[in-house]
A protein has these predicted regions:
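Internal catalytic-core helix/loop-beta-alpha segment
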Residues: 69-117
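Conserved strand-to-helix beginnings and helix N-cap segments that scaffold or border functional pockets
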Residues: 120-123, 147-151
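Active-site beta-loop-alpha junctions enriched in small/polar residues
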Residues: 46, 92, 140-142
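Active-site acidic carboxylates
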Residues: 1-87, 145, 151-158, 163-164
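Histidine-anchored nucleotide/phosphate-binding helix
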Residues: 30-36, 120-130
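Residues at the starts of beta-strands that form the adenosine-phosphate
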Residues: 1-3, 39-40, 106-107, 132-135
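Short, conserved acidic/polar surface loops in the N-terminal third of protein domains
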Residues: 52-56, 97-99, 121
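A short glycine-rich beta-strand->turn/loop micro-motif centered on a GG-aromatic cluster
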Residues: 109-113, 133-147, 165
Length: 166
């Protein structure tokens, strides 16, 4: 059994406050991956409160984004019909994510945004929690803050035996 984790495919990371052309470019591929996936699908949502700028993350990245219940926080329209199983997370990685992996899962595939922040954080949490589980990153369905940071994150994950599907 496989599980697909779609990381932070939210409006603010695609066309909003922290959006990019690279993020926009992966949307069709992520839609195709989700539509054709035979297994459990989990979406993560970066979720902040109106006091975001007063948090440690907000002080270091002073751009309001993914404020709960705003348009920017929502999963993009193209993926919204498939986002039935969502987990909200207050930071880059979700410590609750490992508990959502069912017994009998033999592979977890991750895609989404941003490769160098939330994708790598969640992949590393899963790798630490399940060292024998095959964890795969679908690199074509990920985008980083920059293309260079995307590549660096993929290299870092490869170094800890996370599979990278180019």
């Amino acid at each position: 059994m496989k599980t697909l984790i779609v990381v932070d495919m939210q409006n603010d990371f695609i066309t909003g406050a922290l959006g990019s052309k690279d993020a926009e470019a992966i949307v069709p591929g992520v839609v195709e991956l989700v539509k054709g996936f035979d297994g459990k699908i989990i979406f993560t949502r970066d979720t902040h409160t109106p006091n975001y700028l007063a948090t440690q993350e907000g002080r270091k990245l002073p751009v309001e984004h993914c404020i709960k219940d705003t348009h920017g926080w929502q999963i993009c329209d193209e993926l919204k019909p498939y986002a039935k199983n969502c987990i909200d997370k207050i930071t880059f990685g979700s410590v609750d994510l490992p508990s959502m992996i069912d017994d009998g899962t033999d592979e977890v595939i991750l895609c989404g945004l941003c490769t160098d922040i939330c994708v790598i954080s969640n992949a590393m949490i899963l790798k630490a929690h399940y060292p024998e589980l095959k964890i795969t990153i679908d690199a074509a369905c990920c985008a980083g803050v920059t293309r260079e940071s995307h590549k660096i994150a993929l290299d870092a994950m490869r170094a800890v035996q996370i599979e990278i599907k180019e």
